[in-house]
Amino acid sequence: MWSAGRGGAAWPVLLGLLLALLVPGGGAAKTGAELVTCGSVLKLLNTHHRVRLHSHDIKYGSGSGQQSVTGVEASDDANSYWRIRGGSEGGCPRGSPVRCGQAVRLTHVLTGKNLHTHHFPSPLSNNQEVSAFGEDGEGDDLDLWTVRCSGQHWEREAAVRFQHVGTSVFLSVTGEQYGSPIRGQHEVHGMPSANTHNTWKAMEGIFIKPSVEPSAGHDEL
């Protein structure tokens, strides 16, 4: 059985955050390689299964019982926005380009929980469960994901992978779909190896203007 948490006025919260980002020095990054930057709010598309990373105030009925994370086909769902943040020690100033190999937190905008994984089996595929955890953006060390990409910085047009710092799995989708109450949504889980099921691309969102110019780099993907 699934359990739903408290409701809320989702759109005012999202609108307030997006307006807060649109201050001098913010806005869409249209220069250079079009980089993803710290503080940006975006949707992430799994490039193989064509679903966006999603969460909502519905908890898993098995495993950890934490807030569920899924993939949805809709492009206009407000529950698919995530904010790029640094670890608890910082290291991701607002507007700085995200480096390939950098560890980040992905915070779900409407619930304030961080993308998280741990050693629980996922409900459908029996891979590693991925959940949303924490309160107001504060969780634990299992919220950290390393951005694996080609070059020096995460480019908006490029495919990337997210490898979990604590358990080394890759954020993945393999096509399994849930029934009620989230019928049609896809299971998101962790897999131990890099493959076509775990490549993601930045899509819709608010991208903070880079505070430094990009430079040539290396290949991490």
Curated annotation (Swiss-Prot):
<dbReference type="GO" id="GO:0034663">
    <property type="term" value="C:endoplasmic reticulum chaperone complex"/>
</dbReference>
<keyword id="KW-0677">Repeat</keyword>
<dbReference type="GO" id="GO:0051085">
    <property type="term" value="P:chaperone cofactor-dependent protein refolding"/>
</dbReference>
<keyword id="KW-0732">Signal</keyword>
<dbReference type="GO" id="GO:0005788">
    <property type="term" value="C:endoplasmic reticulum lumen"/>
</dbReference>
<dbReference type="GO" id="GO:0042981">
    <property type="term" value="P:regulation of apoptotic process"/>
</dbReference>
<dbReference type="GO" id="GO:0051087">
    <property type="term" value="F:protein-folding chaperone binding"/>
</dbReference>
<keyword id="KW-0597">Phosphoprotein</keyword>
<dbReference type="GO" id="GO:0101031">
    <property type="term" value="C:protein folding chaperone complex"/>
</dbReference>
<dbReference type="Pfam" id="PF02815">
    <property type="entry name" value="MIR"/>
</dbReference>
<dbReference type="GO" id="GO:0016020">
    <property type="term" value="C:membrane"/>
</dbReference>
<dbReference type="GO" id="GO:0005783">
    <property type="term" value="C:endoplasmic reticulum"/>
</dbReference>
<feature type="signal peptide">
    <location>
        <begin position="1"/>
        <end position="28"/>
    </location>
</feature>
<keyword id="KW-0256">Endoplasmic reticulum</keyword>
<feature type="domain" description="MIR 1">
    <location>
        <begin position="33"/>
        <end position="87"/>
    </location>
</feature>
<comment type="subunit">
    <text>Part of a large chaperone multiprotein complex comprising CABP1, DNAJB11, HSP90B1, HSPA5, HYOU, PDIA2, PDIA4, PPIB, SDF2L1, UGGT1 and very small amounts of ERP29, but not, or at very low levels, CALR nor CANX.</text>
</comment>
<feature type="short sequence motif" description="Prevents secretion from ER">
    <location>
        <begin position="218"/>
        <end position="221"/>
    </location>
</feature>
<dbReference type="GO" id="GO:0051117">
    <property type="term" value="F:ATPase binding"/>
</dbReference>
<dbReference type="GO" id="GO:0071218">
    <property type="term" value="P:cellular response to misfolded protein"/>
</dbReference>
<dbReference type="InterPro" id="IPR036300">
    <property type="entry name" value="MIR_dom_sf"/>
</dbReference>
<feature type="domain" description="MIR 3">
    <location>
        <begin position="151"/>
        <end position="205"/>
    </location>
</feature>
<dbReference type="GO" id="GO:0051787">
    <property type="term" value="F:misfolded protein binding"/>
</dbReference>
<dbReference type="InterPro" id="IPR016093">
    <property type="entry name" value="MIR_motif"/>
</dbReference>
<feature type="modified residue" description="Phosphoserine">
    <location>
        <position position="215"/>
    </location>
</feature>
<protein>
    <recommendedName>
        <fullName>Stromal cell-derived factor 2-like protein 1</fullName>
    </recommendedName>
</protein>
<feature type="domain" description="MIR 2">
    <location>
        <begin position="95"/>
        <end position="150"/>
    </location>
</feature>
<dbReference type="GO" id="GO:0036503">
    <property type="term" value="P:ERAD pathway"/>
</dbReference>
